[in-house]
Swiss-Prot record:
Species this protein is from: Bacteroides thetaiotaomicron (strain ATCC 29148 / DSM 2079 / JCM 5827 / CCUG 10774 / NCTC 10582 / VPI-5482 / E50)
Protein name, entry field: Undecaprenyl-diphosphatase
Protein family per UniProt: Belongs to the UppP family.
Function: Catalyzes the dephosphorylation of undecaprenyl diphosphate (UPP). Confers resistance to bacitracin.
PANTHER family (alphabetical): UNDECAPRENYL-DIPHOSPHATASE
EC numbers, comma separated: 3.6.1.27
GO biological process: cell wall organization; peptidoglycan biosynthetic process; peptidoglycan metabolic process; regulation of cell shape; response to antibiotic
Amino acid sequence: MSWLEAMILGLIQGLTEYLPVSSSGHLAIGSALFGIQGEENLAFTIVVHVATVCSTLVILWKEIDWIFKGLFKFQMNDETRYVINIVISMIPIGIVGVFFKDYVEAIFGSGLMIVGCMLLLTAALLSFSYYYKPRQKDKISMKDAFIIGLAQACAVLPGLSRSGSTIATGLLLGDNKAKLAQFSFLMVIPPILGEALLDSVKMMKGEDVVGDIPALSLIVGFLAAFVAGCLACKWMINIVKKGKLIYFAIYCAIAGLAVIITQL
């Protein structure tokens, strides 16, 4: 992997991790175009995912600081309830990661047709959430957190956008737009770090090898994903507040159809 390929893929990851267009799907498409092999993908994926977590920490640091200050008061306050909701949202993805990891990895290796189909599903979900207008609630309940977590678990499929699925689900439940966007980006931090840790352990045990990726390519990929992630995170929060997700539904529909046509 050259540094230029790493920069392009890093930009793709940073932008699509937050925008509702599926980072896994776009990374799969980009990797296929560049002819990047699976062992290279694993190492690079770990690096760019950690980069997007760092961008979330930077952009949402004020909210994270608020959570920890309230949490260490050791009482049942809004901050503690927020953390409980995040933990509840992690349950479905945790179950998928523990019991269905091999099945999910097999799907990732099944080609781009599944990516195209899931992009169309993302488009349908975003469209439905745009036109359906439930009564808005002020707070995200524990029940809502679990349902949003189910959406996140389904979004392990390549091409099905995680942010698109979780935000659209929350909108259909009537959750506050601004709070929902922040919750969607914060709830993914533990699963991403957990997956990165497991993949790192897997590589160190020798079950997978790091491909011949130069250190420069990894650094460039990290920086590209971090910068793009910071910009996309701020942009996406404003997009959700303004209710402009329909434009991404159109994009996902076009991209999904294009991928499917190329695979026929």
